[in-house]
Amino acid sequence: MGSNTSPGQADPLESENESSLTSRFLPNKRDGGKDNESVIPEKEEPDLNEPVLAVPLPKSRYALTKRSSSSEYPRRSASTSAKKNVIPITRSYSTTFFSKTNDQPTVTGNQDKPISRLRASKLQIQNFWNYICFELLANDTVPANPIKEKHVENFLATPYAIEKTFLFGWFVSVDSFLYIFTLFPIRVLISFFTLSRCIFQGLFSTFFHRNSSPNRSLPRSRKIDLLKLLLIFSTSILIRKIDVSRLYHIIRAQASIRFYVLYNVLEIADRLCCALGQDVLDCLFSNHILSFNFWNPAGWMTFFYYFAISLAYMVLHTLVLLYQIITLNVTVNSYSNAVLALLMSNQLVEIKGAVFKKFEKENLFQLTCSDVVERFQITIMVIIIFLRNLAELYTTSSLDQPLLTFKRLKTLLAPFFWVIGSELFVDWLKHAFIIKFNYIKPSIYSRFTDVLCHDYVASGAQLTQTVTGCSQQVARRMGLPVLPLVCVFIRTSMQTWSMFRSTHSMKQEIAKSIGTIFPTKDNYVYYLPNKEANTYNAGKEASWETLLLSVVRGKSGIAFLFFMAIMLKLLLGKAILAITQSRYESMQQREEKINSWERERKANNFFRGHIEIDKKTKDFLNNSKDDLPVPKSPLLTLERYAMHSKRIW
């Protein structure tokens, strides 16, 4: 190829771009004002034995970058600039020949700059017919991309991976919830016995001036048990006067848009209460609040101050959960599908708020814990609503018909399947897209399970420091509001139980009175409000609901149910402990290879939101083996749905 061979000082623009296409192929000037004879490359004759491709090329756009203004280059004289500006830049097209054996193109004609082989291979569209042929015959083959194939595999594998973590967290939440109704009453009895012994020893040493025991103070774990019992009992008494039926009809009378706003407000209030309540209860159960001298007034003032704040939180959070249950009950019992559609659309909006954001592993762990807690809360709400609707159905049913039939079960359970099914679908879709956009492998959820297993095993190994049980420690990390859920369950269950008992007693009295008036063999007739006669067979009354109510009514029945609940709690806790120990041993073996796990937790944890993320857990979660290679995304290759910053817009 030809090149400029003029001596003297080179142009400033050309000295900066000596390797550029412009400085190599455009004409250059000397400072003396004479044109430099540009060397035009000689036309090489193509080999006729080799096939060639002739492509017409347009004028290069790089010719426009050659500036000749004297104001920009003051060293040049006016004559030099004028002579340079006189040189025309032709728009004629040249023909480039490509040979199979020669990598450099041969330029013929008046050519401003050489072009690459890729640019030369593109056909110039000269008329409309060529454009049509180009559109119809263009090659639309997409090159293979292993990263996108991996994205699709991870997207499809995410639901199975998250369900294993969600299922473990859900069972831990059930174990923590059953703990309050089974083992916690036994711990309270032990705490009362310990308190009585401490009081007796104190009185004995006071009156007889003897030191019967070197340590007469109540252990901190027993104080926490008594405080929990006092909080649950006080909250249940304060919310007892709330008329749930009246609240139900007030919410049901609202318009759909108000109902939608109310549901969102309650959901936000629930999360805020969870974030604040855990800190409040931790302050109340802390060592410096409970460890003070009995005769110290300042210690008592601090204790009552935090107890009042904790009680206010318990009442507020219980009311929020109660309103959520009533709102969900209105949705389930609504004859219009619009309300249920609003509820499901509210769950789908959750995808928009979470998917198009950048997630670190710590944030994904917090989101996973939040979803586990939300799923468990929905389970408790569904059970409460089902029992409530069952009591209403038992109140309005006739005596000669069974309480539960296939048709009634379908009517009762169909809305719950819609609610729970939509929740599962939203969780799967949300986490799958988060995994895709943030270049994370689904194996990260296995590490989340390892973190929860570590908490369970570590709390069980340190029995002297654990005051709330193994499952309670895991529930505390996940942010599960166990005490407010227990309070709202007690409040609704007591009302449902009273409805069952009163309805059953009323039906028995009606059957006896009608049987006395109309004695016909085994059949007794009573009249419904709609004046339709029905036959009631007293000999066949022993249905499952009647048998259950007769058993539970006595003290022996209550003791039997309590024993069954304790056995269920112990079996579930033992199964969870076996799973966590096996995973913990394998986790230690895995982490010893990569040296990314420390076995002892630090005393001061770092809180982010209401889910705990300390430095050790953060280092454990940030493991490079769970990452996918993140390609660099310059502006020319940036795609619409690629996570480049903190959010996808």
Curated annotation (Swiss-Prot):
Record bears the keyword Glycoprotein:
yes
Glycosylated sites: N215
Instruction: Kindly report the protein's main subcellular placement as a broad class.
Output: endoplasmic reticulum
Give me the segments passing through the membrane.
166-186, 303-323, 367-387, 415-435, 480-500, 558-578
Instruction: Report the InterPro entries cross-referenced here.
Output: Tatp1 (IPR008010)
The record gives the membrane topology as: Multi-pass membrane protein
What is this protein's record name? Endoplasmic reticulum membrane protein 65
